């Protein structure tokens, strides 16, 4: 099986889009762009379209499509397959492989399998609202074939006129702040990815209201890497990485292509 547009749209709705290449951590070897695509094919100052970003996402997701397909021992619907791929892309194929969710599913107990989605709402032992929402939507898609706010058509990220501002040619952060009657400092707090107020770019989406955006940094493990090496490169500890990635039960049992959280 392959993932449908509805499945891709579900993943897109939670991953977030960045059309300009960036380094979330200065020590990273490569840049990231689009819906979290990272690698040697991403170059400094590179800008891509939303269509290209989706193409890169589909390429990245294919590994999880193939992985889920191999793990299944029962027939599933397209919507159920989409939900499982979204789940695996978020928590890792290793986590899905060892999960009770997969055990119930392969035993033919679809209802119990669906209920297992909701248990995967923590990171580092703490419940996160974003994970709660993602698991709820995956479960709903799995059971009913419909996921709230996710279309089956090719879609572009939704923007809110009251909460975001798309940078236009000639815009400065101070002018945007003045226009919406706030301060540059507040905008910087709401947009932690903006490190330099003088370096914003046309097309960039800036959060102008609500709570500060919590930065979630993901990293895709490459062949030959160890958790110790990744921790050292990103100036953290193995213990902290394991807290952020509760699906990693053994620090020595990670694999190339696995996506983990760094913060």
From Swiss-Prot:
PROSITE patterns: LYSM
Protein name: Endolysin
General function of this protein: Endolysin with lysozyme activity that degrades host peptidoglycans and participates with the holin and spanin proteins in the sequential events which lead to the programmed host cell lysis releasing the mature viral particles. Once the holin has permeabilized the host cell membrane, the endolysin can reach the periplasm and break down the peptidoglycan layer.
Gene Ontology terms: cellular component: host cell cytoplasm
Top EC category: hydrolase
Domain-related comment: LysM domains are thought to be involved in peptidoglycan binding.
Family: Belongs to the glycosyl hydrolase 24 family.
Stored InterPro entries: Bacteriophage_GH24, Endolysin_autolysin, Endolysin_T4_type, Glyco_hydro_24, LysM_dom, LysM_dom_sf, Lysozyme-like_dom_sf, Lysozyme_dom_sf
Record keywords: Antimicrobial, Bacteriolytic enzyme, Cytolysis, Glycosidase, Host cell lysis by virus, Host cytoplasm, Hydrolase, Viral release from host cell
Matches recorded under CDD domains: LysM, lyz_endolysin_autolysin
One Pfam family hit: LysM
Source species taxonomy: Viruses, Duplodnaviria, Heunggongvirae, Uroviricota, Caudoviricetes
Any GO MF annotation of the entry: lysozyme activity
Organism: Bacillus phage B103
Entry annotation: catalytic residues: 15
EC annotation from Swiss-Prot or TrEMBL: 3.2.1.17
Catalytic activity field: Hydrolysis of (1->4)-beta-linkages between N-acetylmuramic acid and N-acetyl-D-glucosamine residues in a peptidoglycan and between N-acetyl-D-glucosamine residues in chitodextrins
UniProt entry tagged with the keyword DNA-binding: no
GO biological process: cell wall macromolecule catabolic process; defense response to bacterium; peptidoglycan catabolic process; viral release from host cell by cytolysis
Primary gene name: 15
Record localization: Host cytoplasm
């Amino acid at each position: 099986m392959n993932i449908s547009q509805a499945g891709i749209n579900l993943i897109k709705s939670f991953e977030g889009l960045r059309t300009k290449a960036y380094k979330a951590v200065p020590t990273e070897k490569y840049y990231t762009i689009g819906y979290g695509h990272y690698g040697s094919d991403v170059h400094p100052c590179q800008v891509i379209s939303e269509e290209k970003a989706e193409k890169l996402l589909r390429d990245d997701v294919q590994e999880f499509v193939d992985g889920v397909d191999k793990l299944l021992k029962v027939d599933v619907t397209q919507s159920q397959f989409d939900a499982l791929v979204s789940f695996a892309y978020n928590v890792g194929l290793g986590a899905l492989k060892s999960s009770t969710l997969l055990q119930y599913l392969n035993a033919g107990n679809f209802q119990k399998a669906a209920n297992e989605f909701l248990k995967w709402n923590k990171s580092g032992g703490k419940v996160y609202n974003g994970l709660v929402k993602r698991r709820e939507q995956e479960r709903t898609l799995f059971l009913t074939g419909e996921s709230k706010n996710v279309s089956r058509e090719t879609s572009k990220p939704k923007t809110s006129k009251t909460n975001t501002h798309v940078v236009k040619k000639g815009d400065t952060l101070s002018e945007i702040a003045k226009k919406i009657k706030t301060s540059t400092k507040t905008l910087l707090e709401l947009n932690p990815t903006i490190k330099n107020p003088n370096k914003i770019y046309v097309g960039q989406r800036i959060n102008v209201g609500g709570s500060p955006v919590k930065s979630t940094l993901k990293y895709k493990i490459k062949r030959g890497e160890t958790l110790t090496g990744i921790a050292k490169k990103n100036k953290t500890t193995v213990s902290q990485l394991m807290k952020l990635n509760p699906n990693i039960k053994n620090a020595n049992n990670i694999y190339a292509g696995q996506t983990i959280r760094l913060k």
